[in-house]
Amino acid sequence: MRLFAISDLHLSFGVDKPMDIFGDQWVGHADKIRESWDSRITEDDWVLVGGDTSWGLSLQEARPDLDWLGERPGQKILIKGNHCTWWTSLAKVRAVIDDSIHLLQNNAVAMPDGTVVIGARLWDPPEAPWADEKSEKIYN
């Protein structure tokens, strides 16, 4: 068993937002990810997917991206990113994902070797220049 990590896939199989709008280097980015993933990752490996998996705004729009991810080899641990507006609740997302995808949201995922991955939302310190009233409620 090996552990890999990747983030910000920004897949768009369910919406019309190809990554190549950001430049020619992004042409075929999903194919490049698939080729690299499928040639390196085995069914015994685990992959931390650090958020921003899909450009979809709803679960329906993100579903083709989640299906694509489920087709990749290995066990995937998926955490919600700041662009994951489609991730409305654990129950709703769990209902549509492949068994090889494990959701991480204020919980933990134990891997077969005893490694435990813990996930929770990151909160910026209250003195951060971008902190706002919502952040203030967390600390007071």
Enumerate the language-model features and the residues they cover.
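Short, flexible active-site-adjacent loop segments at beta-strand->alpha-helix junctions, enriched
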Residues: 9-10, 82-83, 107-109, 121-126
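Short, hydrophobic/glycine-enriched beta-strand segments
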Residues: 2-8
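Core catalytic region of metal-dependent phosphoesterases/phosphodiesterases
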Residues: 2, 15-113
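Active-site-proximal loop/helix segment associated with metal-binding centers of metalloenzymes
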Residues: 11-27, 116-140
